[in-house]
Each structure stands twice: as structure tokens, then as C-alpha cells.
Amino acid sequence: MAENALPKGYEPRDVEERWRRHWEDNRTFTPDMDAPGEPYSIVIPPPNVTGALHIGHALNHVLIDVLCRNARQQGKKVLWLPGTDHAGIATQNVVERALAKEGLSRHDLGREAFIERVWQWKEEYGNRILNQIRMLGDSVDWTRERFTMDEGLSKAVRKVFVDLYNGGYIYRGNYIINWCNRCHTALADDEVDHMPEQGHLYHVRYDFEDGSGSVVIATTRPETIMADTGVCVHPEDERYAGLIGKKILVPVIGRAVPLFADTYVDREFGTGALKVTPCHDPNDWTLGERHGLAFIQCIDEDGNMTAEAGPYAGLTKEECRKRIVADLEASGQLVRVEELNHSVGHCYRCKTVVEPHMSEQWFVASTKLAPRARAAVPQMTQIFPESWMKTYFNWLDNIRDWCISRQIWWGHRIPAWTCGKCGKLIVSEQDPTACPDCGCTDLTQDPDVLDTWFSSALWPFSTMGWPDKTKDLATFYPTSVLVTGFDILFFWVARMMMLGMHFMDEVPFKHVYLHALVRDGEGRKMSKSTGNVIDPLAMIDKYGTDSLRFTLAAFAAMGRDIKLSEDRIEGYRHFVNKVWNAARFSLMNLPEEAPAALDLDNVKGMHHKWILHRLEELKASQAAGIDGYRFNEVAQGLYRFWWNEFCDWYLELIKPDMQAGGERQATAQYVLWTVLREALLLLHPFMPFVTAEVWQALPGHAGDDIATKLYPAARPGCRDVKDAEHMELVQATISAVRTIRAELNIAPSYRLTTLVRPASAEDAATLEEGREMLMTLARLDGLTVAVDVEAPKASASSVVAGNEVIVPLTGAVDFEAELARLDKELGKIEKDFVQVNKKLANESFVSKAPADVVAKERARAEELSDAKAKLEALQQRFRDAIGK
């Protein structure tokens, strides 16, 4: 028996902590830059410093870790680079809330003191998520940990901004932007969450200035009427033929504005006449520019009405809406109000309704950068699943310039200064001391900071030392693959593509794998309000990390959301225990030292040949599956091999070998040792902790670290399909006897006699070769394999690949007792069957009960019908056996 026997039960907490510490202390995952091997690199999607580990993070990190550990096994030079994002708006909001508890605001502190306070918060709490990530067993290189506001990354951000500005790719100008009244900052288009809301469509009468009539306009935002500077209709709309060019009066304030035509107008919406409010709608802004309209702002940055709102100045926009609707109704200009379901934009951070707002902002000319990013897919970068390519192309084809300035204090401050004397704008990597034109030293830096996604878009190369020409950049850029959620395809992936192509002249990653969402077991989105959130840390504490990891991988089918429930995680905890117990059994049957090597290509014993064949199939399918990002298929293949083939079959088959001694035992020990260690290597990327613990307990592996070992080499000589087919016939025959035993309620301890009428001479020889296995695992007292066997009247039979398996029942079954038992069971089933059918025959139940309840009853009826048919067939078999 091997000395390094494992404890009876697997305790994940102690094992995991020990291996985490071992890997980090020994810098196991820091790549040796001088070692041979193809580079393989992945940058972590940087979590927010404000964040806590959620199940989506866990999925993302498990999949990346599988890829990285697998790549190391292939002998590649692997870098998985970790880090965090400063998360401008989110972090500032957290610190502002903390200040509010002290009765302070950021303005009370001032900019410098507030930023210092944020840094203090970051140092105290910002590493929380990284410590939580450590719990997952991520094989990252912690020596290369980065933060988006590190000195080196900040240097890269400034250089990119200045280079883009000097190249005409960044500009400043007035435009309609998305404005959050709560966060007091601009938002990019993809930072706006559009949610359905129940609202109203107000039909308002606008009178012509000359008193000749009126036009009815439909709007969802009557509070912006005071900023109207035109009314637009479609040039081919016959309802307004002859009216184009007339002056029309804006209700309440009486401003005369033009009625003009533009093909932008949808003739089918509302009345076909559109109020144009350039300062409060991006499409109206475009119309205003195109037709030379005035630009008037009636809602300010706080969501209050400006002086331009006339009698409503000072009101909130919500109060203004109520007042103006009442006033329009009183004046007779409110024609009617309709209920309307429409999409309303909300801030992705605080969920406040977003206000279109005219403001001077900084923009990246994305329209200039997009073409190269588009052309790179799929020639240089492949997206998995391929279905997301169309979405990627559509977004880039319809891209708008990216608003990158944010009116907050925490973040990369825009490197632009204005001269107080001559007004010159100075954009510089270094802080200027004087104006280059007039020499004035009174320089004011732009107060805004850059959108968080701006620095994140540089992550693949800024983290490796760019703009310096570092060894990391030369070795690991472009990265091998990006694994991330589909929800940030536009926020992050496309922008990394644009800036990577522009500054590195190469794509940032060769592959992009977009995983789906993790939902609850019923397919619902997880949310705190629903109470269905699965906390990964709680699951790790309860079931161990390997259980959670394997569950997520096993359900990570490409392009399909994951339905996750705690019972599934618990189920894979049983799998971890199965691996542990299989290892314990193996160690009890292995010598203290590594067993003597054998030529496995010529090993004797069909069960040995079979398990080696299945192991070779697993190696090949796993390598192809991971390369194709089919994580679920690989995980399910591992599960089948370990649970069904290795544990349920092979370990049972070798028990007689281990008792036999001599060459037979030595052969079994070497095959067992080989299969166990190679199966551990295959399982390791998915379950790093339990495999590491078992590995170092194997004979010949004391002190070894499985994380540094290579993928098991292929053995072409063990891929003979015939060997596997022979064993599978023996297995199927054993299963057939076991099924008959279970169906007929024959005690497991009772040894049966079995007759087999073989389909061919080859099958007969195979069954004879497997006689000992058949006798042992099917618990037989006798076995006859012959073409002329006769089935006794009282017998049960089954056909396996053309071979008839016959089990005589006399003495094995008490027919009278079994018939009585079956009568009793059938009576209960028939009673339940009548009740269910009665319920389904009730039209009131079928029409009024919830659909899932009706479906459940129908499934129950089908289940009872099947059970009834099986019991009746069994009953008839017993009657035939005794001539009843």
C-alpha cells in the first residue's frame, strides 16, 4: 500500500488555502521569460475596485483559468495578467456616500483632498475583489498586477490622448450628450440602459402665427415645449402640402418658429408633425444643424427648468410636466393623451432617467477608427460564437463619435490646459508651465476626467509597459484570447480593437470568446430584489472551489445562458468526493514507489486495453474541445470518464487482479497508476485543488506540483477500436443481467445463472475472455456461452448487440409473492392515474390553471401510464413463467 494515503474525507478549505499560498509564494504562474515555448497570454477583464465577486465574475475566471492551465500543460509560456479598474463614477459615488454619512460633500473637501480620500478608500477596500478572486484558484501572475491609474498606465493614457488629439481623432465641441442629473456627468451612448416604461403621448395644438389654422403635434415630453425652435413634417406628407414655410407659435410662450420639411420624419408616428427641440434630443440636434434653427436650453444640469422655460423657471422637470399639461388643458391646446409603452434611457450606474443635454465635451472620432477594427474580423481576430460577429459589424457600421469627458473628479484628468491670457488650448503629455504662444503662466487645466472605458480600452498593451518597448510587449502582444461577457462587446471589446489597431498596428487579441449570462435554475435573471442571487463565495465556503468551478464549466455551452442552481453545485461536490475516494482506493492498491513501467501498447487484459483506449479518446476530445471553447463538452467528458468508466467500471474490474499477485497484479498496478495520474492531469484545469492534493500523494510524486506538469502524451498504440468494442460487449452483457435483476426485484446477493446465445464466433470468444469479469460483476453462479442454448420457460431475456442474454428465474424469483406485490403497486398507480385524468378532463382546470401546472399534470399522467404498462408487462412475464 502507498504510504501517502489520503485522509478519509476531503476537506476543501484547508487544502485550497495551502495550495493557493504555495502557488503564490513560489510564483508558480510567473512565466520564465527565457524558457522555450510559444507565448500564450490573456489579460484579465479588470473588475471595478468597488466590486465584490459575483457569479458572472466566477464564470469568466473559471473559463480563463481552464485555458491558462491547459496552455501550460501544452508547454506554452503563459501569462495571465491580473488587475483592477478605477471605475470612475462607481468609485466616486461610493466615497461620496461615505462622506455624506459624515455630513460632508466632495465640494466641502475640495478636489485634491477628495481625490486623496478616494485613494485612501482604494488602498483600504480596493483589493477586496482581488482577494476574493484568489479564492477561485486563478493561476494569474500576481507580480504583474496592474491598476488603471498606476503611474505607468496613466502615462499611456496621456500619450494616447495627446497622439489622438494631434492626429485629429479627438476634438472638443458642443453636442447633445447623455446627461445624468444624479451623477452630474456625461454618459456615452452605451452607458445608457434603455428600459421599457409606461408613459403618455400628448397631442398638443400649435397655432399658425397668421391665425389660419393649426397643427397637432404628438410628444412624450411636454416639458421641453419651451425650447422648441421648429416644427418638421415629411416633404411628401399631403396633409401639410402648402403649409411648409409658414410660421407657427410655440404654446405657452408664443415664440414664432418655422414649419419645415425633412425626410427624417416618420409620417406614421402620431400626427406626422414633429416638434424640434435641438438642445434636448440628439435627432433634433441634427435637424437643427441641418436647417439652421436656434438652440435653446430649458432644462439645466440639475434637471431644473431654466429661465428659457418662462413661467416654469425653477421647477423640476417632473413638476414642469404636470404644470404645463394642466395649463395646456386649461387653454384648450391639449387635444388628447394616449397611454404609451416606450423605451426610456437610464444611467447604467444609478438608474436615474438620462437627460439629453447640450454641453461642450471631448469626443473620440470613432467613425475614423472603426474601419480598421471592422476589417480585422475575422481575418485577424475570430469571435466565438460566430453569431456575435454580425452584432459587432452592425455596431461599427453605425458607430457615433464617443463622448469621453466626464464631469467627475476621480479618474484620469484630461491633459488639456487653457491660457488665461490668450485663450490658447494646450494639449500635452507633461504639465505645461507656460503658454507656448504668449508665455503666460496662468494656465487652467480642463476639470473633466476621461471615461473609465478610455483607459480600459488600452488595457492589453498599457499593462505590458507601452509606450516603452518592453520584453512583455514583444513576447505577449497580441494576446491569445479575450474571454468576457457579451454585454461589454461595445463598451470594451470594440474599443480595444480600435485603439489596439491604431497604436500597435495589430489586433489586441487573436480570439474573442463571449460567454453568456448566468441565470437561476428557472432561467430568470439573478437580482437581489428577486432573492435568487447565488453568491459564489458562499458556494465556495459550503461546497469547495472545485465544485463551483466544475459546475460553471459543465454548463458553459457556447452561446447559451447558464441555468445555475445550488443543487447542481452540490451535485458536483459529490463528484469531487468521487475523485477523492477513487484516489484513496487506488493508493490502497498501489506500491509505495512508482510501479515498474510496462509496454502499454501490448498490455494484456481487455479491461486494461479498454480503459487505456478510453483515456486516449478523452485526451484527443479534450484537446479539441478546449481549443474550440466547448468547455461544457470537455467537462461532461471528464465526468463520464471519471464517474462511469474509471470508478464504476475499471476500479471494480481490477479488484480480482489486485488479489491475484504476481504479473497480473503488477500489470493492474501500473495501468491503474498511469490512468489515475493522466486522468488527474486532464481534470486539473477544471479542478485544480483536489487534483493537486491527490497528485502529490501518488507513488513517485511526493512534493510534486501538478500545476507544472505537461499534458499527457498520446499513445497511438492504445487506440485499437476492436479492443474497446470487446470490452463494451462484456459491459453491456453485465448491464443486461443487472437490469433484469433490478426489474424483477432479485436480491443483489443472489447469484444468478446466465445463458448467452452469441451472435458470432468472435462475440463468443470475447465473452469467454471476459468470463471472470461477467461472473464477478454480474454476480453469477454459472455462465454458458453457446449457440444452442435453450431458454427455460421461466426466464427473462435481453438482446445485446445481437447476442441473446437469458437469465433462468426458477429459484431466483418467488413468482406468487412478486405477483401479489405487482397487484398492489398497480392498484395504487391506477388510482393515481384515474385522479390525474379526471383533473385533465375538467375544462375549467385546463383553461384556468397556470400553464406550468397543467403541463406538470400532463407529464404526471404520461409517467403513470408508462409505469402501468411496464408493471403489466412484468406481471404477464411472471404469469407466463408459472403457466398462469
From Swiss-Prot:
Keywords assigned: Aminoacyl-tRNA synthetase, ATP-binding, Coiled coil, Cytoplasm, Ligase, Nucleotide-binding, Protein biosynthesis
InterPro entries xrefs: aa-tRNA-synth_I_CS, aa-tRNA-synth_Ia, Anticodon_Ia_Val, M/V/L/I-tRNA-synth_anticd-bd, Rossmann-like_a/b/a_fold, tRNA-bd_arm, tRNAsynth_Ia_anticodon-bd, Val-tRNA_synth_C_sf
Short sequence motif named 'KMSKS' region, residue ranges: 525-529
SUPFAM superfamilies associated with the record: Anticodon-binding domain of a subclass of class I aminoacyl-tRNA synthetases, Nucleotidylyl transferase, tRNA-binding arm, ValRS/IleRS/LeuRS editing domain
A biological-process GO annotation: valyl-tRNA aminoacylation
Coiled-coil segments on the chain, per record: 812-884
Pfam family, one: tRNA-synt_1
Gene Ontology CC: cytosol
Residues that hold ATP according to the record: K528
Example GO molecular function: aminoacyl-tRNA deacylase activity
Main location: cytoplasm
UniProt subcellular location: Cytoplasm
Motif 'HIGH' region, chain ranges: 47-57
Broad enzyme group: ligase
E.C. number: 6.1.1.9
Catalyzed reactions per annotation: tRNA(Val) + L-valine + ATP = L-valyl-tRNA(Val) + AMP + diphosphate
Quaternary structure note: Monomer.
HAMAP family xref list: Val_tRNA_synth_type1
Domain topic, free-text comment: ValRS has two distinct active sites: one for aminoacylation and one for editing. The misactivated threonine is translocated from the active site to the editing site. The C-terminal coiled-coil domain is crucial for aminoacylation activity.
Stored PANTHER family: VALINE--TRNA LIGASE, CHLOROPLASTIC_MITOCHONDRIAL 2, VALYL-TRNA SYNTHETASES
Role according to the record: Catalyzes the attachment of valine to tRNA(Val). As ValRS can inadvertently accommodate and process structurally similar amino acids such as threonine, to avoid such errors, it has a 'posttransfer' editing activity that hydrolyzes mischarged Thr-tRNA(Val) in a tRNA-dependent manner.
Homology family: Belongs to the class-I aminoacyl-tRNA synthetase family. ValS type 1 subfamily.
The protein, known as: Valine--tRNA ligase
Gene, per the UniProt record: valS
